[in-house]
From Swiss-Prot:
Stretches with biased composition (Polar residues): 52-65
Domain of life: Bacteria
Descriptive protein name: Small ribosomal subunit protein uS14
Family: Belongs to the universal ribosomal protein uS14 family.
Ranges where the record places region Disordered: 51-72
PROSITE patterns given in the database record: RIBOSOMAL_S14
Keywords: Ribonucleoprotein, Ribosomal protein, RNA-binding, rRNA-binding
Function: Binds 16S rRNA, required for the assembly of 30S particles and may also be responsible for determining the conformation of the 16S rRNA at the A site.
Gene Ontology CC entries for this record: cytoplasm; small ribosomal subunit
């Protein structure tokens, strides 16, 4: 299982992303607006850089439900590749079978 601190850190990232979602969207809209002045766009970039890093949704990871493994995550099943293979070999995943050709 994943450490409790890793789970807490992920929860913190989700909360920060929700909290700053509107602010980030507003600043990104100014940055991508071609009609905005260069000074306004530059100020928006600087303000975006002052926001917490963990408020960016791209910092979030999808951990495996069984083990908490953050890499090799298969989103359709919510499991890491290792646990998905084990479950498939036991026949616990409906409609999933080992490939053979």
């Amino acid at each position: 299982m994943a450490k409790q601190s890793m789970k807490a850190r992920e929860v913190k990232r989700v909360k920060l992303a929700d909290k700053f979602f509107a602010k980030r969207a507003e600043l990104k809209a100014i940055i991508s607006d071609v009609n905005a002045s260069d000074e306004d766009r530059w100020n928006a970039v600087l303000k975006l850089q002052t926001l917490p890093r963990d408020s960016s949704p791209s910092r979030q990871r999808n951990p495996c439900r069984q083990t908490g493994r953050p890499h090799g995550y298969v989103g359709k099943f919510g499991l890491s590749r290792i646990k998905l293979r084990e479950a498939a070999m036991r026949g616990e995943v409906p409609g999933l079978k080992k490939a053979s050709w």
